[in-house]
Amino acid sequence: MRNWKTLLASVLAVSMGIGSAVFAQDEPAAPPMTDIPRNETIIINNPEQPATNPGWFNIWVAGSGGGTSNGLHQLVMDTLWFIDPDAGLKGSTYNELATGPAEYNADFTEMTVKLRQGVLWSDGTEFTADDVKYTVETQIATPGFTWSAQFADQVASIDTPDKYSVHFVLKKPNARFHSIFSVRWGGAWIMPKHIFEAQADPKSFDFNPPVGLGPYTLHSFDPNGAWYIWQKRADWDKTAMAEWGEPAPKYVVYRSIPSVDKRLIEMVNGNLDMIHDLSPEGMFSLAKQAPTARGWFPGFPYAHPDPTLPMIIFNSQNPKFQDKRVRWALALMLDPLEISMASYRGAATLSAIAMPPTGTHTDDYFAPLQDWLINYELDTGTSKIKPYDPTVGERIAEMVRPQFGDAVPTDLEAIHKSFGYGWWKKDLKAAGELLTAAGFTKNGDQWLMPDGQPFAFTIKTFTEGVMNRLGTDVAQQWTQAGVQVTAEVAPFIFRDDLPEGTYEAATAWSIETWGGNPDLSYFIDSWHSSYIAEAGKRQPPRNWQRWQDPRLDAIIEKVRSTDFSDHDANVAIGNEFIKLMVDEMPIIPVMSFNVFSAYDTRVWTGFPAAESNPYANIVNNWSNSKYILTQLKPAK
């Protein structure tokens, strides 16, 4: 198959403001816009660096140097279900290539899926059950493909009772097997059988141009990987996405713009419609400079809370952190307002519980649990205290109001969803009582462990950004409270330090949820004690803290045997998990991962908004951001 055309991009001068221009020698090339009408085009910032292998579209091969969030997995790929981290258009779960939910037998050892009829691949070939069967069997037979290990571990057999039905027999019961085909950020994409079966080696096939089930096809791309242009299919109505409407833009451009400042400038100048992420300071600047631009919230704190929970992780295999009184003491040494200001300049959405405060979780978990949290008692060994402060969100709002004025919400519900419901009180007296009860003593201002050695450790953190700021700040707060903590930058924290256990404490995350569904399965199954590696050996994702408890295993086993669609049962399990995590404090939850995504409404309107129509996630490298295109309308 021939390679699709590439367009050589000229070096462009980029306007840096009124009356000045800077020759952008070090910036990736901008896409040529002369051949595509601006009023029919949406231009989106791709957060990936320019692709090192730009013509590679075989998304099933990891580490190939091709792009993923360059439009490939948003506009071209498709699978059985999508789960939005927010409200969704008709609920957060989308039956995409499937016509309805997965159908399991009584013991969850078999799963049947009914498929949409009339869906066409972009080359006109009909999508059928044979494509799903081929995808699974090819993945299993091809180690090195992204989903090979998961399918091989779980699928005993797959057959197609008819052209639009797929039946799986599983190797062991699993009420969440369908989640492999459920997109949160990405998922197990369906392969076009008629294309790949003709390849001698499917792993070395570049899949250029990609043949997809989505409503767009490749128009052109930069040979240096800086931009990709996609064109709407004439037969877009033969895709599953057509159920939610016609995507409005005829063309979609994804641009890699590594410089945060350059992203800001391009949006101010009208050359960018959606930004994946800015720094907090960049977002504040955009709000002042571009009246047609905004973030997820209409005013401060602007950012979209992702269903990811930045936290302080303790290595539970380290004796320093094996007593929950010590972990609780460390939590009570921290000032949540200082954390918010240091990490996000006040734009953090704090969480006292082991759940990101985003999507439907605020209604399913945070609001209903407020009374329990307010009345929660902690025995310090000397006294009983109620450590939860439900006014933290309001206090942060008041703290930033002098600077940001009317941009800061005043409605209590809006404050809770923007800044969080509450957090733990800074209580050095209670922290000291807990440490004393655990056998610690104090020498001057320094806490000593039961063996007489200074209580000191290192906290590993990111190289930059809000996570680095968080790590640096908590280290300073603990040091001021008498625990000598040093923040240490770990450039490959998720690749090396966390899985290898070569850390004492860290700022990172081990909880990621669906966001739009109360089910915990996206992260919690990996927390089962059966997956915990011995000290010195590599830990599989995501239980980086290596914490185990029989009560946690029992919760995980309940999740495995509970129907995904049973909302109330899954909320009950979630509450059980949250309360256990509060009691034991194996990690200190801090906040959601707030992404300063932005959009401009000069060319397109109809974007989702937190306060009025939160139908989709505006963080545009997520595959489910594609639904936004069906709701857009030309601004003029």
Model-found features: residue ranges?
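Aromatic- and charge-enriched surface segment that lines or borders ligand/interaction sites
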Residues: G100-F145, P161, H167-V169, E266, ...
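Aromatic-rich, solvent-exposed beta-strand/loop patch
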Residues: G100-E103, S122, V169-M191, P210-K262, ...
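Surface-exposed binding/hinge segments that line
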Residues: D35, K114, S148-A198, P215-T217, ...
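Extracellular/periplasmic solute-recognition and catalytic clefts
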Residues: Q139, T146, S157-I158, H219-Q231, ...
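Gly/Pro-rich hinge or "lid" segments in bacterial periplasmic/extracellular proteins
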Residues: Q74-G88, R184-P247, Y251, D261-K262, ...
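Detector for C-terminal structural segments
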Residues: D26-E27, M33-I36, N46-P50, G71-L72, ...
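N-terminal lobe/hinge region of extracytoplasmic solute-binding protein
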Residues: I43-A106, E137, V211
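A short beta-strand/turn structural motif
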Residues: N53, F57-S64, N70, Q74, ...
